[in-house]
Amino acid sequence: MKRLLATTAFGLVLAMSGTADAGFILSGGTSNSIPGNNDFQSDLNALALDGFTIDYTDLTVDAPGTITFRVHGKEAGFTNGFESSDAGIDEQYPSDFGFDLPGTVIGSYSVADMEDFDWMFTSAAGVDAALGEQGFAIFTLNANGSSNIGTSVVWMGFDDDGAGPDDNHDDLIVSARFASAVPEPATIGLLGAGLAGLGFFARRRRMC
C-alpha cells in the first residue's frame, strides 16, 4: 500500500509539472510548401511540418513562461549562427551537420506574455535575417498557413542568401520550445482529486 501511495503521489507530481494550454501566436503570413531543395524537407515532414511562411507580421506568446532553444541542422557554405541578446545566445556554426533530434540546447530565458522577440539568424558572409524578414522562415503545420500556431514549439529556418534567395531555408534549423509558468486548470483539478483519493485510501487503511 505504501508503494502504491508513493507511486500515485509521484504521478501527481509529474502531472502537476505540465504546462498550461498556452503557446506561440503567429500573426499574418502566407504559408508555402517546403521545397524539395531543402535538405531537411523529409525530416520536417516527419514532424508534420510541410509548409513555411516568411511574410508573417509578428510572433509572440500568450502567457508568461520559459523559451528553450535547440539547434537541429545546417546545410550551408557560410559560417552561420543564431543569436538573441535577451536570451544571452550567440552561437556560430562553421560546419554542416545533419538533422538531429532532440537537438542541442543552446540557451533559454524567461519571457512575459505578448513579449517581442529579438531573435536573429546571422551569417559571416551571407545576409543576416531577423524575425519578420525574408531569410527568417517559420515552418508551419500545413501549407495553408494560420494566424495562430497554437503550439508550444516553433521551428525556424534560415536562408543566408548565399546561393541567391532560393527560399529553401535549410542554412540553419533552430527550434524554440515554450513552457508556460502557469499550471492549467485541468491539471490543478487532477491534483486535487488525486490528493483527495490518497487521503481516502490512507484513512481506509487505518480503519482496517
Predicted region positions:
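Short, threonine-centered small-residue motifs that mark membrane-proximal processing/anchoring sites
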Residues: 1-24, 173-201
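Residues within well-ordered beta-strands of beta-sheet-rich folds
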Residues: 70, 157, 173-175
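Extracellular carbohydrate recognition
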Residues: 165-173
